[in-house]
A protein has these predicted regions:
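Polysaccharide-binding surfaces and accessory modules of carbohydrate-active proteins
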Residues: 1-141, 157
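Short acidic, Pro/Gly- and aromatic-enriched capping/linker segments at domain boundaries
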Residues: 147-164
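Conserved, mostly hydrophobic/aromatic
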Residues: 42, 166, 212
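An acidic-aromatic substrate-binding cleft motif
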Residues: 189-228
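A generic secondary-structure signal marking the coil-to-beta-strand transition
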Residues: 124, 167, 208-210
Length: 228
């Protein structure tokens, strides 16, 4: 998950309670103002005396009351990852996701909504990036009033999580970012967040040692002699 040191960030917690069932949903918003980053996650807490099941939970959701957007996603396969697909947001539902147990190279667990004239260097765009490598689901919906909704979270297919009384389900985090300076600036926002607030360890901001990739040259049958 995204972390911060000292006073780099603030967190807003909003607790929603269903008085009929005693179930609480806690919405957590983390703010990194210097990076134009907001993080969002959800906790589902069973405050009742009975066992419940969570069948669907989205970590982040945004509503756009007006605007005409394009949806940008990234698909791929072996040796051909991260291919950009840009399509108009149409009425109804457009969805990406994975049920492979991993997010995989088929679909990257992130989405961008961009204004029609947005390029690399100018224009408004919104990003959602899931800090999770398992099954996921991203969806964009446009209704009869031309309002757009953007959601990202755990894949709902085959998802059924039991919560005993007093237990809490912690949904993975989503990174949100916006800029009016084009896709390049949006990428920089996300890169800076990942580099400084997700990566850890000695080499987080230092030049890393050289890593020798022996796969194509020797596969798994390598020795000091074959590597030399």
């Amino acid at each position: 998950a995204v972390y911060a040191d000292n006073d780099e960030a603030q967190t807003l917690e909003i607790v929603l309670e269903d008085p009929a069932t005693g179930v609480e949903a806690m919405l957590l918003y983390g703010v990194l103002p210097e990076l134009d980053i907001i993080t969002r996650s959800v906790y589902i807490r069973n405050q009742s005396s009975e066992k419940i099941y969570v069948n669907k939970v989205m970590s982040a959701e945004l509503d756009f009351l007006y605007g005409d957007y394009d949806l940008l996603t990234f698909y791929g396969r072996h040796a051909m990852e991260r291919n950009l697909q840009r399509v108009p947001v149409a009425h109804g539902s457009q969805m990406i996701g994975s049920v492979r147990g991993t997010s995989s190279h088929q679909y990257n667990p992130m989405m961008i909504l961009a204004e029609k004239d947005t390029t690399e260097d100018h224009g408004g765009c919104y990003a959602m990036s899931f800090v999770y490598s398992g099954n996921f689901q991203g969806e964009v919906l446009k209704d009869q009033y031309n309002q757009t909704r953007m959601l990202l979270g755990v894949q709902e297919e085959c998802f059924r999580y039991p919560l005993e009384a007093g237990e809490t389900f912690y949904a993975p985090e989503v990174i949100l970012s916006y800029t009016d300076q084009g896709m390049n600036r949006l990428s920089q926002n996300l890169h800076s967040c990942i580099r400084h607030h997700i990566c850890r360890g000695k080499y987080k901001t230092e030049v890393r040692p050289v890593l020798v990739n022996s796969w194509e040259a020797a596969y798994f049958d390598f020795t000091g002699e074959t590597l030399y």
